[in-house]
């Protein structure tokens, strides 16, 4: 293993620590995935407890690990920290071959204030991570304004283009209220962004990897599981590193076609209903079938539509036992129409 410490901004004391593991030789692969660690500290400092221990946990899983000690203290004015992130991510991608990593498989993990920075990276950065792990992240106005007035509130910037997110928090966090994670989770759900969330019964704030030598308070015995769970989730999102290289991701990034540039039977009923009158005419076989079901079961058509609105057009047509040929014909017509998003 090699370690490098690169100064990104001497005036603001911004550094990037790189931990680079070997490839080839006894290993049968040439590139590893990478993780960029963003420690917390209220934008006043970067916590050591959320730096090396986190990097080492991901290195054990095969990752090249990087720790960004971004602008804090008197240099924390926004957008300095985000600019530090952009510079670090650009450097990691630029040196991907030298640092033996896959530039398309760089994730980021952030804690507290670093979780805020990580959430901003996932939502508004030019160089978004392939996936973002947000551990007790600062998201909402009260906590963000306390750390640094003028910073963005990440949940307000979530779109379909936001990086997939893994959220970790404890219900009894009295530093960053659990509503921060819940509101971020809701924004991700509303925009169709893949996510996984683990809210533990107790653990407070600042538990990092929750190993005994790191924490100084009581946490649920299950809190340390977030590390292995997040690594497992990254395998689903980016593919797994095996002795022979990477496997393909085994989770679809998009749950439906609502964010695609053109319409299809993969779009949800709720989304299709927002489209043009021309689209509604094409949906006549679906609407007729739903009216028949509503009449047979004593439901209102509006009530049935609301209940199944999250299902895709294909799922509903199949439930109505519409012939596959007709489904494909509808799909072909929809493919000729622009998706009006928003």
Outline where the language-model segments fall.
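N-terminal cap/lid segment of alpha/beta-hydrolase-fold proteins
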Residues: 1-30, 82
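Short beta-strand element of the alpha/beta-hydrolase
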Residues: 31-40
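Catalytic nucleophile-loop/oxyanion-hole region of alpha/beta-hydrolase
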Residues: 47-48, 68-103, 220-223
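Short amphipathic alpha-helix adjacent to the substrate-entry channel of hydrolases
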Residues: 48-66
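Primarily recognizes the serine-hydrolase "nucleophile elbow" in alpha/beta-hydrolase
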Residues: 87-160
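Short beta-strand/loop motif that positions the catalytic acidic residue
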Residues: 161, 166-169, 173
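Conserved alpha/beta-hydrolase "acid-adjacent" motif
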Residues: 174-183, 226
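C-terminal catalytic histidine-bearing segment of alpha/beta-hydrolase fold enzymes
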Residues: 193-257
């Amino acid at each position: 293993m090699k370690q490098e410490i690169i100064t990104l901004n001497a005036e603001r004391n911004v550094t990037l620590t790189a931990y680079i593991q070997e490839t080839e030789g006894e290993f049968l692969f040439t590139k590893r995935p990478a993780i960029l660690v963003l420690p917390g500290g209220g934008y006043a400092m970067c916590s050591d407890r959320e730096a090396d221990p986190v990097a080492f946990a991901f290195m054990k899983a095969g990752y090249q690990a990087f720790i960004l000690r971004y602008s804090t203290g008197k240099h924390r004015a926004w957008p300095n920290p985000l600019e530090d992130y952009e510079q670090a991510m650009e450097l990691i991608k630029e040196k991907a071959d030298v640092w033996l990593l896959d530039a398309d498989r760089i994730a980021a993990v952030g804690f507290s204030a670093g979780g805020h920075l990580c959430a901003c990276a996932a939502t508004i950065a030019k160089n978004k991570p392939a996936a973002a792990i947000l551990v007790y992240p600062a998201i909402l106005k009260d906590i963000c304004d306390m750390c640094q007035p003028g910073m963005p509130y990440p949940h307000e910037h979530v779109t379909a283009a936001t990086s997939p997110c893994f959220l970790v928090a404890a219900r009894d966090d009295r530093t960053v209220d659990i509503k921060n994670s819940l509101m971020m989770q809701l924004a991700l759900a509303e925009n169709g962004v893949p996510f996984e969330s683990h809210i533990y019964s107790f653990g407070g704030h600042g538990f990092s990897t929750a190993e005994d030598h790191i924490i100084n308070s009581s946490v649920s015995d299950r809190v340390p599981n977030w590390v292995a769970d997040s690594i497992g989730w990254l395998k689903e999102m980016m593919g797994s590193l095996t002795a022979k290289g990477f496997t393909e991701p085994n989770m679809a990034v998009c749950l439906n076609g609502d964010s695609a540039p053109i319409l299809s039977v993969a779009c949800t009923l709720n989304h299709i209903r927002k489209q043009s009158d021309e689209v509604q005419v094409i949906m006549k076989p679906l609407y007729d079938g739903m009216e028949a079901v509503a009449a047979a079961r004593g439901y209102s058509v509006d009530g049935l539509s609301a209940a199944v609105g999250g299902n895709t057009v294909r799922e509903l047509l199949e439930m109505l036992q519409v012939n596959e040929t007709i489904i494909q014909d509808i799909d072909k017509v929809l493919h000729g129409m622009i998706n009006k998003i928003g």
